Amino acid sequence: MKFKDKLKFYVITDSNYSDEVISVEESLKGGATSIQLRMKTSSTRKMIEVGNKLRKLTSEYDALFFVNDRLDVAQAVNADGIHVGIDDMPVSKIKEIAPNLIIGASAYNLDEMKTAESEGADYLGVGAVYSTNTKLDARDLGINGLKNISKIANLPIVAIGGINHSNVENVLKCGVSGVAVVSAIVGAENILKSAENMNELIKKYIK
């Protein structure tokens, strides 16, 4: 299976909603194919401690494991990849230091998409498709903006931002390779059930 095929159901951690290890295990049981560890305010030691546990879980479920922003942590926990924003370490520099990592890059507009592609990113995280409380600095792109980027992008696209069970089908109709979800999964009362339901919706569009 190519890495692109594992981008279809991409869950991002958020300890404001639930414990990372518990939420990831339930998400994986429910069909998640990629996990991203995002711990913006935690110490490096804590990130590595949690990251090692998530690496073990993702390996057991044959899912991809990404670390948000932190190349040092991604390397320390033997992650499959890293996801960076436009203000983080340039993709080209990451490729120089860690050529084996899968690199995802955030893109809020066409210029950022072109920058990510030219620097050698492996996939794009495109959004925010809808307003979201989990990333307050995100700029809303909207469905039309997502469609426009999807039409011309040369890389797999993972849509992100405010995606939930009621709007995910509209997002998938834009021709993306996957959807990244935070609160709709890790913030759910029953994470396993929520993940299973989301997985069924995704499978209608991406096999």
UniProtKB/Swiss-Prot annotation:
It is an enzyme of class 2 (transferase). Pathway: Cofactor biosynthesis; thiamine diphosphate biosynthesis; thiamine phosphate from 4-amino-2-methyl-5-diphosphomethylpyrimidine and 4-methyl-5-(2-phosphoethyl)-thiazole: step 1/1. Disulfide bonds: none annotated. 2-[(2R,5Z)-2-carboxy-4-methylthiazol-5(2H)-ylidene]ethyl phosphate binds at residues 132-134, 162, 182-183. GO terms for cellular component: cytoplasm. Keywords: Magnesium, Metal-binding, Thiamine biosynthesis, Transferase. Its cofactor is Mg(2+). 4-amino-2-methyl-5-(diphosphooxymethyl)pyrimidine binds at residues 36-40, 68, 106, 135. Binds 1 Mg(2+) ion per subunit. It comes from the Archaea. It holds the Pfam family TMP-TENI. InterPro entries: Aldolase_TIM, ThiamineP_synth_sf, ThiamineP_synth_TenI, TMP_synthase. CDD domains: TMP_TenI (cd00564). Mg(2+) binds at residues 69, 88. Its EC number is 2.5.1.3. GO terms for biological process: thiamine biosynthetic process; thiamine diphosphate biosynthetic process. It catalyses: 2-[(2R,5Z)-2-carboxy-4-methylthiazol-5(2H)-ylidene]ethyl phosphate + 4-amino-2-methyl-5-(diphosphooxymethyl)pyrimidine + 2 H(+) = thiamine phosphate + CO2 + diphosphate; 2-(2-carboxy-4-methylthiazol-5-yl)ethyl phosphate + 4-amino-2-methyl-5-(diphosphooxymethyl)pyrimidine + 2 H(+) = thiamine phosphate + CO2 + diphosphate; 4-methyl-5-(2-phosphooxyethyl)-thiazole + 4-amino-2-methyl-5-(diphosphooxymethyl)pyrimidine + H(+) = thiamine phosphate + diphosphate. One of its GO terms (molecular function) is magnesium ion binding. The keyword Ligase does not apply. Condenses 4-methyl-5-(beta-hydroxyethyl)thiazole monophosphate (THZ-P) and 2-methyl-4-amino-5-hydroxymethyl pyrimidine pyrophosphate (HMP-PP) to form thiamine monophosphate (TMP). Belongs to the thiamine-phosphate synthase family. PANTHER family: THIAMINE BIOSYNTHETIC BIFUNCTIONAL ENZYME, THIAMINE-PHOSPHATE PYROPHOSPHORYLASE. This is Thiamine-phosphate synthase. It comes from Methanococcus maripaludis (strain DSM 14266 / JCM 13030 / NBRC 101832 / S2 / LL).
